[in-house]
Swiss-Prot record:
One of its GO terms (cellular component) is membrane. This is Early E3B 10.4 kDa protein. It comes from Human adenovirus C serotype 6. It comes from the Viruses. Keywords: Early protein, Host endoplasmic reticulum, Host membrane, Membrane, Signal, Transmembrane, Transmembrane helix. Residues 1-22 form the signal peptide. The chain crosses the membrane at residues 35-60. Down-regulates the EGF receptor. It holds the Pfam family Adeno_E3B. It is found in: Host endoplasmic reticulum membrane. Its main location: host cell. The lineage of its organism: Viruses, Varidnaviria, Bamfordvirae, Preplasmiviricota, Tectiliviricetes.
Length: 91
């Protein structure tokens, strides 16, 4: 079972990126002063970079979770501890 936090974190980041791009797509730049347009596009770039970094971090956490699960399951059954498995949400 994949931890729900990783899925939620990825979905929130993708939602932020998509909603930001959708909001910017409907802006008429002819009606706004140049400084405001540059400021707006700066914020859009910042939001997209933060969303991308969040998705990358969530992906790295997912890979780490898989590696921990594989390493735990490779141990001999007599050394497996059920409380640690519950803590790591492995089984």
């Amino acid at each position: 079972m994949i931890p729900r936090v990783l899925i939620l974190l990825t979905l929130v980041a993708l939602f932020c990126a998509c909603s930001t791009l959708a909001a910017v797509a409907h802006i008429e730049v002819d009606c706004i002063p140049p400084f405001t347009v540059y400021l707006l596009y700066g914020f859009v770039t910042l939001i997209l970079i933060c969303s991308l970094v969040t998705v990358v971090i969530a992906f790295i956490q997912f890979i780490d979770w898989i590696c921990v699960r594989i390493a735990y399951l490779r141990h001999h059954p007599q050394y497996r501890d059920r409380t640690i498995a519950d803590l790591l949400r492995i089984l």
